[in-house]
Amino acid sequence: MKIAVAGTGYVGLSISCLIAQHHTVCAVDLIKSKVDSINNRKSPIQDEYIEKYLAEKDLDLTATLDGETAYRDADFVVIAAPTNYDSKTQHFDTSAVESVIDLVMKVNPNAVMVIKSTIPVGYTEQIRKKTGSKNIMFSPEFLRESKALYDNLYPCLLYTSPSPRD
């Protein structure tokens, strides 16, 4: 199975390392130095498990700046793009998530998209209506910084579901 992961922060890189043990993963980022680090099996973030997995495990993992190609070839796209909270407007900035969804819909509308980013209540339903896609779902992350891969390997809670109306 081919899986693309949009974003290589704590959430994206930890899920990439986890999945790349058994599937082909292409991690996508906008920052060349992060892509180069991952392709050289060095972690661009501080996380003991990620550092160890990149250095020692046989991971089927590559990183790229080319989201279009990565998403076109993917069966699943995990979206771990930043959604910073703006305390002045009291809203999450979901523009990075929406950019990924728009590109996936353009190049591979049949791919299943799993949003791991923090998003507001009702966002998944709203974006599914906007795109006309039932292949978008949300799976919240419960990760600690510097322990992200560990928390993915040994989760305290797993939850994902498409709309019950599907």
Where in the sequence are the language-model features?
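Rossmann-like NAD(P)(H) cofactor-binding subdomain of soluble oxidoreductases
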Residues: 85-147
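Acidic/polar active-site rim loop that often engages polyanionic ligands
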Residues: 150-158
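Conserved small/polar residues in nucleotide/adenosyl-binding loops
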Residues: 159-166
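N-terminal Rossmann-like NAD(P) cofactor-binding module of classical short-chain dehydrogenase/reductase
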Residues: 78
